């Protein structure tokens, strides 16, 4: 019994060595991030992407984290998205890119897995692959992604339902701060919003990325929008 405190301390130390927490945003400026300067800034202690009807992006562009690629990880952050009127009634779409690659560096365009969110009632929480295979899991679905003859059109096997889409939507606060969590371990991907699991995916395809960059999306749209991010915490295995 006398050895138990030592064993417990050893286990705690081992766990600490295995996992590393890293704050990705200092709350003050864009240090560690790069994007099209005219669209990104820090406002009210948050990374802020903004377009207006008179000043739009020509295609989806991203604020890209500059400290290398990430493989297995847990990422949590808070986000807020509003339409051109500062509400959540018209257009507003964004997402968190992970295990992605830069495909157009001059305009900070990436492709890859995306944890989607929006002002609307449908897409927040889904798994989307930007400039790739499109929607891989709708909100509330457990999915296994299988190979097919066309790598861009994989076979999506829905193996279960986590929750109804409308019940997940009811937990999202419009035009306010929400918490997003992404867990990626091997080919197993999970998204959470405000503690609610929204998708659970196993990607068994060869093209499923195992590592890549992190980035935040500013979406092209018919009208302006503002998206903000803060409290960005990355946990990885050392």
Language model: regions and residue ranges:
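Carbohydrate-interacting regions of secretory-pathway proteins
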Residues: 19-238
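Bacterial N-terminal signal peptides
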Residues: 5-14
């Amino acid at each position: 019994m006398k050895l138990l405190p030592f064993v417990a301390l050893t286990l705690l130390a081992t766990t600490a060595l295995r996992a590393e927490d890293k704050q990705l945003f200092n709350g003050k400026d864009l240090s560690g991030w790069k994007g099209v300067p005219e669209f990104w800034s820090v406002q009210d202690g948050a990374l802020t992407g903004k377009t207006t009807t008179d000043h739009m992006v020509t295609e989806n562009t991203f604020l890209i984290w500059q400290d290398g690629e990430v493989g297995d990880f847990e990422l949590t952050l808070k986000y807020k998205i509003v339409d051109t009127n500062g509400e959540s009634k018209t257009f507003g779409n964004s997402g968190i890119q992970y295990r992605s690659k830069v495909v157009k560096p001059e305009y900070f365009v990436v492709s890859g897995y995306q944890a989607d969110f929006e002002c609307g009632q449908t897409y927040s929480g889904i798994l989307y692959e930007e400039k790739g295979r499109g929607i891989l899991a709708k909100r509330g679905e457990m999915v296994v992604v299988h190979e097919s003859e066309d790598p861009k059109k994989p076979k999506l096997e829905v193996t279960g339902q986590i929750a109804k889409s409308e019940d997940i939507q009811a937990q999202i606060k419009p035009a306010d701060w929400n918490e997003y969590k992404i867990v990626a371990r091997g080919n197993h991907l999970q998204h959470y919003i405000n503690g609610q699991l929204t998708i659970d995916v196993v990607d068994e395809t060869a093209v499923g990325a195992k590592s890549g960059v992190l980035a935040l999306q500013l979406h092209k749209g018919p009208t302006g929008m503002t998206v903000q991010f803060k409290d960005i915490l990355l946990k990885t295995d050392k």
